[in-house]
Amino acid sequence: MYLTPGITAQEYADRRAKLAQSLPDNGVAVLAAAELKYRSGAVFYPYRQESNFLYLTGFNEPDSMAVIRRTGDKLGDYVFHLFVRPKDPKAEQWSGPWSGLQAAQDVFNADETGDINKIESLLPPLLRSASKIYTDVELSRAGQPTKFANMVRSVNRSLSSAPLQPIMNNLRVIKSKAEIANMRLAGQISGRCITAAMRRPWDTEKDLQAFLDYTFTANGCEGPAYVPVVAGGSRANMIHYVHNNAALDPAQLVLVDAGGEYGTYIADITRTWPVSGKFSAAQRDLYEAVLRVQRTGVALCRESAGMTLDGIHRVTENTLRDQLRDLGFDMGRAGALDELFPHHVGHYIGLDVHDCPGYGRHVALKAGHCVTIEPGVYVPDDERFPAHFRGMGIRIEDSVCVDDDSPLVLTTEAVKEVVDIEALRG
């Protein structure tokens, strides 16, 4: 049975078992669901579950808490408690149905469940014999202990705690076959939508964003994975430009950083193309320089290469420096490369766009790691740089799954060769 698209109840149980195995004897992990966030007044944002909570439970509702306790030495020796809202027909008439306590056991396979409204009396007994608590639940706010911190202190003031995130990073960073399949589908849909956008002329950044948001959803994604960058002309030199409200100039390039989400897994793609559909000579020269660098980085996303993301970044810097020098850039000037390429070449991806926060880029890439490779060049409009490249911003990004001997590009449907981009409009 699938609890979320592509991910079975058994896979969620296996994840909990691996977490428990990572804890010391009688260690306890405590996770809180994300809160519903409000835009203004009573107007709320679409709900997004906290990623570690979702990874371990598949439960996509607020006002919930999960407790996982190691009970023995064998894989699978753990107890899973899931505290949720009880069914409430009157409240559900307003908000829509929620799962309730029985479903927490019958559907989400909790060993024990309870009313989240009674958590202050239900949680402390579970912590009394714990050897250590692993949690990222907030312990203080505005200098004062939170309700959760007081619950822990009521059990044992000397009970030690540690962050859960480092353990979760080690579990989440290597993707399962099911996770990779979800990311491949997200990449396939997103890539096709971006290619479809390249086929059409656009007058404004806003219209282009609206097209992508719609087509991601209409073609099977849950929606956009993040607020996209749609940056025409020199606005592409602002790495995270998301105003997306300016007119597009047919003589310039447009940079689009966008992707859809499928089964809560994301695609992360950047493409840059001429608004007119045809590259000028200068646009083509700079674009192809970045593309050569990007291809080099993607080719290193294999376990047999023995590379890290930091290592690929160094290769990218060296290759890009040579490419830009050949185009007439003064790369001997101190700080020139850092100004033209100010960000890292890649990051981990998965449930989050920047997945597994804190997991090092110095770690050797292994089969199952999923990363982005995204070199870019952002040329300021000033006399230190060749006149025909000034104001151009170009980035090319793919989502890539590391395999043993070759990379699996998850976003290959988004075309990136000059000949393919220009052929889209005949």
Predicted region positions:
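Active-site neighborhoods and metal-handling regions in enzymes and metal-associated proteins
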Residues: 1-426
